[in-house]
Design a protein with these regions (language model features):
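Helix C-cap/helix->beta junction micro-motif
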Residues: 27-30, 131, 189-193, 308, ...
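N-terminal small-domain helix-loop-helix segment of the aminotransferase-like
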Residues: 3-97, 280-281, 374, 388-393, ...
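Conserved glycine-rich beta-strand-loop-beta hairpin in the small C-terminal domain of fold type I
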Residues: 276, 292-302, 312-325, 361
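Conserved PLP-anchoring active-site segment centered on the Schiff-base-forming lysine
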Residues: 109-128
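Active-site phosphate-binding strand-loop segment of PLP-dependent enzymes
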Residues: 142-210
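Conserved core segment of the aminotransferase class I/II
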Residues: 221-292, 303-304, 387, 401-402
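PLP-dependent enzyme catalytic core of the Aspartate aminotransferase-like
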Residues: 158, 339-348, 354-411
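Hydrophobic residues in well-ordered beta-strands that form the structural core
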Residues: 116, 137, 197-199, 350
């Protein structure tokens, strides 16, 4: 029988983030102690009022509009306009089963080339590969807070020589946990060259200091804002995300609606109705407590690992760190991460999965291996956190960091 799988698809591997989680679970079943620092999932419960809204609407069983429930689209537009000072209307919003699907369909639609900062989230590049879009990487470094400079972006646009291009910009960043500080300068270059920006703002509500700033404020006509419930609302398994697309990109939006109709049809009705509660109710206390915990845990990991053998940028949002290890033993970050897992039980994702050159000893560390329900329940309100709280409610983080520190010092 001839091969029934297309050659292109046969070259793909499972998503690195999902693969490391499955590998960790297999090791745990064999009796090995594993510190699950490889999988990025919010450890916190969905806010009670949002859960109750889902229960209340569980009987909703009709197909909804391919673009999404109009009431939900309206409240998301208002939410963005209030929090980000945007000017979106309900017709600018498209609801999807997570932003990942919407990004994939956008890659299929887009007639041009893709610009990705390295590091970037693990699925941008494979999606571009499937869609047969050429990817242009911009290598960044800790000195630029793991974001590209405006000059780097302009040089890359010029090298593409007149082709349409789209820049994926994720802040707070997965995998580095840093926040982009040069949005205005990037926006000026994008506007000058009519570059489309896909602003992946899934972690925006988990910015630790100050109010989150969106690049859409500086370049509204060319920026697609992408976000959803998975990170700030602890609802990764609910699979609800959205795109906010400016009227100037009407053709892209209309094409995306067509692909939505020919793929997932519409997002789960009960989830969409429950999401109205998420975007209209006051979740400020919940978010304050969640950010307090994440900031404390992230800074604990940073302070205990940052040294002359491990270089890390201070966490600014989300729940990741991107340590760079100093050693000459390994030829690739993949080899290094396998050694760490084998010798310490600490599961990390190699920097090469995020577009970083293999010979750079970088890895993503997700500091969410703890019971967020207990941590949140017992430390909410004005309670100031200390290391005793960490040892009590996040022992895997404490022990895993100790193991990783011991491993790094062995070199």
């Amino acid at each position: 029988m001839n091969k029934i799988i297309k050659e292109l698809i046969g070259k793909l591997k499972p998503s690195a983030t999902l693969a490391i989680n499955e590998e960790s679970d297999k090791l745990i079943k064999t009796g090995k102690k594993v510190y699950k620092f490889g999988f990025g999932q919010s450890p916190f419960p969905v806010p009670n009022s949002v859960v109750e809204a889902l229960k209340k609407n569980a009987s909703k069983n009709s197909y909804l509009s391919m673009q999404g429930l109009k009431e939900l689209r309206s409240v998301i537009a208002k939410y963005l306009n209030k929090n980000n000072n945007n000017d979106f209307k309900s017709e600018d919003i498209i609801i999807g089963p997570g932003t990942k699907e919407l990004m994939f369909l956008t890659q299929i639609i887009f007639n041009g080339e893709i610009i990705l900062p390295a590091p970037s989230w693990v699925s941008y590049q494979p999606q571009a590969f499937i869609a047969k879009n050429k990817v242009h990487w911009i290598q960044t470094s800790s000195s630029s807070n793991w974001f590209p400079t405006a000059e780097q972006i302009e040089n890359k646009i010029k090298s593409i020589k007149g082709q349409n291009s789209i820049l994926f910009l994720n802040s707070p960043n997965n995998p580095s946990g840093t926040v982009c500080k040069n949005l205005k300068e990037i926006a000026e270059v994008a506007k000058k060259h009519k570059l489309v920006i896909l602003a992946d703002e899934i972690y925006s509500q988990l910015t630790f200091e100050g109010h989150y700033k969106s690049i859409s404020n500086y370049y509204p006509e060319g920026t697609i804002v992408s976000s959803g419930l998975s990170k700030w609302c602890g609802a990764g398994g609910w699979r609800l995300g959205f795109f906010a697309i400016p009227s100037q990109l009407q053709d892209l939006k209309n094409s995306l609606k067509i692909l939505c109709s020919e793929s997932f049809s519409s997002v789960s009705a009960p989830i969409q109705y429950a999401a109205i509660e998420a975007y209209t109710s006051d979740q400020s206390i919940y978010l304050k407590d969640v950010k307090k915990i994440l900031s404390f845990v992230g800074n604990y990991v940073y302070e205990n690992l940052n040294s002359n053998v491990i270089n890390i940028a201070k966490p600014e949002g989300g729940f990741y760190l991107f340590p760079e290890f100093t050693n000459t033993k390994f030829s690739s970050s993949s080899e290094m991460c396998r050694d760490i897992l084998s010798k310490t039980g600490v599961a990390l994702l190699p920097g090469s999965d995020f577009g970083i050159e293999q010979n750079k000893m970088l890895a993503r560390l997700s500091y969410t291996d703890f019971n967020g329900v207990d941590f949140l329940k017992n430390t909410s309100g004005g309670k100031k956190l200390d290391n005793d709280d960490l040892k009590k409610y996040a022992p895997n983080v404490v022990d895993g960091v100790s193991k990783l520190k011991g491993w790094s010092n062995s070199f």
